[in-house]
Amino acid sequence: MFLLLAACAARPAGAQDEPRVQVFGGYSYTRFDSRSFGFSDSSGLNGYNFSPAFNLIRGFGVAAELSGQYGSKLNFRDLAVGPQFLYPRGKTLFFAHVLIGSARSFVRVGAGERDTERAVALGGGMDLDLTSRFAVRVFQVDYLHTTLFDEKQNNLRFSTGIVYHWGTLKRKGHRAPVQP
């Protein structure tokens, strides 16, 4: 994870333009650490991931994320925001983020239990441009740390989908000298 953050922070001289705004929507699968809830194994949850991001300067922006994953006896949703680091290479955009927010879980056992607690997501991924406005998020992987029901959960989320982007943060080049 730290290597991905370091790679995103290093800016080569020939870096490509970056999108000003990105909106991602897609499928997600979470391997949820539900053993702390009394389940015998971790739960495989399917759902969605939605993430708008606004890139402030080259290589850095702010991202928000809303996701929901659902299983037969367990639902999990999170909302988080934080810094995003970008590293464009040709038609590929690598990114890493650190998001902090809250998670909500509903366990359908007996009368059912709900809890909302803090959540931290550390992750990154890769987008591949299809057109000037659309890209496919080839992969996004997030480590999610939650503390639902006064227990720690270490979860892993995989996402893929479509990214819509507009506006660009252009590379600053040399200006031609003004002729008198």
Regions found by a protein language model. Give the residues of each.
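Bacterial N-terminal signal peptides
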Residues: M1-C8
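Short stretches within intrinsically disordered, low-complexity N-terminal or propeptide regions
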Residues: C8-P12, G123
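Short glycine/proline- and aromatic-enriched beta-strand/turn motifs that initiate or cap beta-hairpins
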Residues: A13-L56, V62, L66-G68, R157-S159, ...
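Generic short beta-strand segments
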Residues: Y27-T30, G101, V141-L144
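Solvent-exposed loop/turn segments connecting transmembrane beta-strands
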Residues: R35-L45, Q69-R77, G110-A111, T147-Q153
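Gram-negative (and chloroplast) outer-membrane scaffold detector with strong preference
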Residues: S51-G123, L128-L130, V136, Q140, ...
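Predominantly the C-terminal beta-signal and adjacent terminal strand-loop region
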Residues: T131-P180
